[in-house]
A protein has these predicted regions:
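N-terminal leader segment of winged-helix/HTH proteins
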Residues: 1-31
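Conserved segment of winged-helix/HTH DNA-binding domains
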Residues: 6, 98-117
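A structural signal for well-ordered alpha-helices, especially hydrophobic packing surfaces
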Residues: 13, 17-20, 104, 140-144
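N-terminal helix-turn-helix DNA-binding core of bacterial DNA-binding proteins
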Residues: 21-62
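Short helix-coil-helix linker/hinge
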Residues: 30-36, 97, 122-126
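A cross-family signal for key residues in well-ordered alpha-helices
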Residues: 41-42, 105, 133
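Canonical helix-turn-helix DNA-binding module
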Residues: 47-92, 98
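Terminal interaction helix/tail motif
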Residues: 109-154
Length: 154
């Protein structure tokens, strides 16, 4: 790590991932991997997405791995639907099933509880909360720009 700020960001991100994974596991939201959860969240935010759109957000993951993950969400877990576009049969779109929407809502509820607990435990003053929110909005903007995301303010 180049400096203390980078180390702190890494350490925080690692702990957040562990904390969320443990809370989601406790809630029995479903036996989902990180990648499966992220795909559900992406499709939930953006609506129908092609498999290639989803894959473009994972540049270091092969298209076959993304496709296999989506097939598992579709065939085994019944959380997404796959549909071949009639006008271009080379394109398969993915959308959430009703079961997928329910699982996603439970994931969001669990995450809201986790982040709510963390926010309260920080003991920030109203001014600090406002500043913290600005920092988070800037970080979100950076990641959206870097990843080419357009999640409509989500």
């Amino acid at each position: 790590m180049k400096n203390n700020t980078e180390k702190l960001i890494y350490d925080m991100a690692f702990r957040v991932r562990l904390y969320i994974a443990s809370k989601i596991s406790e809630q029995k939201v479903g036996d989902l991997t990180d990648r499966e959860t992220l795909i559900l969240e992406l499709v939930g935010m953006k609506g129908n997405m092609s498999i290639s759109e989803i894959g473009s957000l994972y540049p270091t993951v092969s298209n076959s791995t993304i496709s296999t993950t989506i097939t598992r969400l579709w065939k085994d877990k019944k959380l997404v639907d796959k549909r071949i576009l009639p006008e271009n049969q080379r394109v398969t779109t993915v959308s959430l099933t009703e079961k997928g929407k329910k699982v996603l809502e439970e994931i969001k509820r669990t995450q809201a509880e986790v982040f709510g607990t963390v926010t309260v435990s920080l003991g920030l003053s109203p001014d600090q909360v406002e500043y913290f929110q600005e920092i988070l909005e800037n970080a979100i903007g950076f990641f959206d720009k870097t990843l080419g995301l357009n999640l409509d303010g989500s």
